A protein has these predicted regions:
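Extended polysaccharide-engagement surfaces of secreted carbohydrate-active enzymes
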Residues: 1-238
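Beta-strand-rich recognition/accessory modules
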Residues: 219-221, 235-237, 242-294
């Protein structure tokens, strides 16, 4: 019932927001144009309020000014349909099937969000290569089978020494722009997010650079336990794990997420300077390998 805000450019970015403030708009438009989905959403909003024990929208003034609102009755509820929609200009794919949904985004390091009821997963592909610290797709397309294909070319380069000795020994006063650059190699990263039975398949392909320690970062929110073939752990949101087991279950008393297969070829999970921080309050799981990998 909450609104997806990870791509917001406003004050509500990454906040937990419910559609309470839209109640009057749904009611007015639903009544005026006889739109059952809008009227059902009005009832669904109050179902959310009762379930979450949160304050109701401030609508008293509207009910006082419009007697027709006070006398109107509607019994239905809004039933969320399955859908998959790609907003090409924004670079966002939103999809829902049953009670799980997912979002894929271009130009975001947290490029994948997967919600299953009360549990949430965020995914990054991260590592250090020149000035780059994480994968941020430059392009995004939807293939014929519904797969989201994201791609980034990370340009490799470094400064060559000064051709002539600088007049100063102060690094910050040197004319760095006068130095020539050694270009290459480039790292190519492709990510494929494919709809699958009961969830999604994610494929990560790196190429062009050999031996760089990169990682797939999975941040879990709303979970209480993690279990694999060899361990079951209660979690509180501060844990950091590298998982090599074939399958990992992250769950609470209502919902669960199954992830796998795991792989762990190194323990370099912190990244270098300027690496992005972990998601606050989330359990962080890593799958790690050296480039190039698939």
């Amino acid at each position: 019932g909450s609104i997806f805000t990870a791509n917001s450019t406003r004050f509500d970015k990454d906040r937990l927001v419910y559609p309470l403030s839209y109640y009057m708009e749904y009611l007015a438009m639903g009544m005026k144009y006889d739109i059952p989905e809008f009227l059902g959403m009005c009832n669904t909003i109050f179902d959310i309020i009762e379930e979450k024990k949160i304050p109701s929208p401030e609508c008293l003034i509207y009910l006082m000014l419009h007697p027709e609102y006070r006398s109107f009755e509607y019994e239905g509820r809004y039933e969320q349909p399955d859908f998959a929609r790609f907003y090409e200009d924004s670079g966002i794919l939103r999809a829902r099937k049953g009670h799980y949904s997912y979002t894929v985004m271009r130009e975001k390091s947290n490029f994948l969000y997967f919600h299953n009821g009360t549990s949430k997963l965020e995914m990054k592909v991260a590592g250090s290569f020149c000035e780059h610290r994480a994968f941020k797709a430059e392009t995004m397309e939807i293939l014929a089978d519904g797969t989201a294909h994201l791609h980034q070319t990370m340009k490799g380069w470094y400064y060559l020494p000064f051709e002539e000795k600088p007049e100063t020994s102060d690094w910050w006063k040197m004319d760095q722009s006068s130095r020539k650059k050694k270009l290459g190699p480039d790292m190519e990263i492709d990510v494929y997010v494919k709809p699958a039975e009961g969830g999604i398949d994610v494929r990560v392909v790196t190429d062009g650079v050999s031996g760089a320690p990169w990682r797939v970062e999975l941040a879990f929110s709303g979970i209480e336990f993690m279990a694999s073939e060899h361990v079951m752990l209660p979690v509180n949101g501060s844990e950091v794990l590298v998982i090599k087991d074939p399958e990992l279950e992250a769950y609470n008393e209502k919902d669960s997420l199954l992830i796998g297969p795991g792989f762990g070829e190194h323990r370099f999970t912190e990244g270098k300077e300027d690496s992005e921080a972990k998601t606050p309050g989330a359990v962080t799981v890593y799958f790690t390998d050296y480039t190039a990998f698939d």
